[in-house]
Amino acid sequence: MIDFFLKSEYLPAGDQPKAIKEIENSILLGNKYQTLKGVTGSGKTFTIANIIKNLNRPALVVSHNKTLAAQLYREFKDFFPNNAVEYFVSYYDYYQPESYVPSKDLFIEKEATINSEIEIKRIRTVTSLAKRRDVIVVATVSSIYALGSPDFFKKSAREFFVGQRISIKEISDIFVELYYERTLINLERDKFSIKGDIIEIWPSSEHGEFAYRICLDFDEIVKIYRISSFSKKNLGATNSFTLFAKSYFVIPYQNVLEAIPKISYDLDLQCQYFKDNGKLVEAERLKQRVEYDLEMLRETGFCSGIENYSKYLSGSTMGRPYCLFDFFPKDYLLFVDESHVTLPQFRGMYNGDYSRKLNLVNFGFRLPAALENRPLKYDEFDALINQVVFVSATPGFEENEKSSVTVDQIIRPTGLVDPEIITRHSDGQMEDLYIEIQKRVALKERVLITTLTKKMSEDLTEYLVTLGVKAKYLHSELDTLERVEVISLLRKSEIDVIVGINLLREGLDIPEVSLVAILDADKVGFLRSATSLIQTIGRAARNSNGLVIMYYDKISVAMREAIEETNRRRQIQIDYNKKNNITPKTIVKKIQNILEKELNNKNKNISYDFEKMVSGEKLSKKKLIDKLKFELEEAVNDERFEDAIVLRDKIKELGSKISVARNK
């Protein structure tokens, strides 16, 4: 078994060693629930990484949105370069579920656009879990949605090895059985090609852009090579490789044959129910739709909306659908990041899905079995937990109630303390805010301002700009790349102020920010709850000059709770620093990322490569652009938007050079 190897320049510091030890001890004692209550910037991810390494168990880390999941994915990839770190989130770019609106007698067909790159990462996730134990999966709420049988997926594995007696046709039939398609032109992802006694396949389940080339002689495999998927360059020989299905919805044809009479039986029962209750239209509608699906299943083994028959096809006898949790070994560890938000999100998934599908069943569009293609109920999710660590700066009632151990992680390795909080009456707040901004600008520091509405953020930004402040607003109407560009401008000091609404959602941990101003801090609501206020205060906790100003009309209960908790933590941190002679230092975070440096280095050689390509000494430049476009798509799907911006600009630059050359 491969052990987890943690790569880091640093050792645990501050409260991290204590937190690691106490949580590990609790897990080793067999406790199911434990909580890591860590302040912003205390290195909770590094603590989790150390726990995974020390306990040496597979781990699932769940977050409440794709952006934060992507950040965690990148961090764990850096921490564990020699282990399988995977990413499992929704693969839909656009999704309109099948639904029926009785008041309008309107049936809406399912429409979806699947993101192929995220789908690849999902396949890699289940493949890694089927092959090895040293796996860390970072996921979202997608982890509780229905998947195929893990047993069927594992049994789909086929090994190919040098010396194996097998024909080209037999290999081809196996590939087709595993849902791979043959291509007669260029080799593409999840397809295979045959040329004489050579068969090549590019499985997306493999990490890295490479394919396999199998060479046969008289129905015997004599050589297996790994080759570059783009250039076909030989990357070296291998004695064997294992191929899994390209889908985690593996359905043996025998299961399809066995399911058909069960579906027919339930169809007769439901049609009779409708007729007995005078619903003749519903009975006829259901009969037509299901009989058409049955005919497709008999002829092809597939039908549109086959997921609605998963109860019959999956072989599950558990009374619930399979999901990602079922692909993990029994001793896995679960980490719920930002649990105060993630747990309520998981709790709410089932009800919304159920109410939509119930209409489809009641009006004869689907059999009752369609209700079983669903996300898990919360108690089912809880039952699948082996041992869990809830991770949050502000744990909710459930975490506090269930946990055998709650460990505070208050001391930051950097020595930084929670920001000072000042409360000021809202009278004259605009003038006061402008003065505070000017103070920060003079120190070359940045400012975040949080409002309650989009209109307020836009109006305040416009007002500040008229006063000569370099400011931009940030809210959901900006697309993802635009939001990243605004954050990048702030870090580069091209603007000094960002005005936003829910700055927590943006994941704004920017060390240059020394002032967070909270307008209408006393208003009642989610964005001004004690939990949200504490989280917002944390945005100023990465700078040694951190300050938070709350503007109010009347100090609220939530304000008082947030201030008291922050001051409690702040005093503990100050006392620790005095005792250990620590001087807090602002976190230094490089603005230029690693990929941007790599691309700059690549760019130095682009003109050189270009000249050689023009003279016929290199491959076509189109392939280079295709490669960069592929990297761009991966960057966007991984939520590495700063990288995506850099790649986009390089592609544009390279493309313009090509057009100039063609016009010469």
Swiss-Prot record:
One of its GO terms (molecular function) is DNA binding. InterPro entries: Helicase/UvrB_N, Helicase_ATP-bd, Helicase_C-like, P-loop_NTPase, UVR_dom, UVR_dom_sf, UvrB, UvrB_inter. Gene3D superfamilies: P-loop containing nucleotide triphosphate hydrolases (3.40.50.300). Keywords: ATP-binding, Cytoplasm, DNA damage, DNA excision, DNA repair, Excision nuclease, Helicase, Hydrolase, Nucleotide-binding, SOS response. GO terms for biological process: nucleotide-excision repair; SOS response. Residues 429-595 form the Helicase C-terminal domain. Pfam families: Helicase_C, ResIII, UVR, UvrB, UvrB_inter. Residues 25-170 form the Helicase ATP-binding domain. Residues 622-657 form the UVR domain. ATP binds at G38, V39, T40, G41, S42, G43, K44, T45. A motif (Beta-hairpin) lies at residues 91-114. It is found in: Cytoplasm. The beta-hairpin motif is involved in DNA binding. The UvrABC repair system catalyzes the recognition and processing of DNA lesions. A damage recognition complex composed of 2 UvrA and 2 UvrB subunits scans DNA for abnormalities. Upon binding of the UvrA(2)B(2) complex to a putative damaged site, the DNA wraps around one UvrB monomer. DNA wrap is dependent on ATP binding by UvrB and probably causes local melting of the DNA helix, facilitating insertion of UvrB beta-hairpin between the DNA strands. Then UvrB probes one DNA strand for the presence of a lesion. Belongs to the UvrB family. Forms a heterotetramer with UvrA during the search for lesions. Interacts with UvrC in an incision complex. HAMAP family: UvrB. This is UvrABC system protein B.
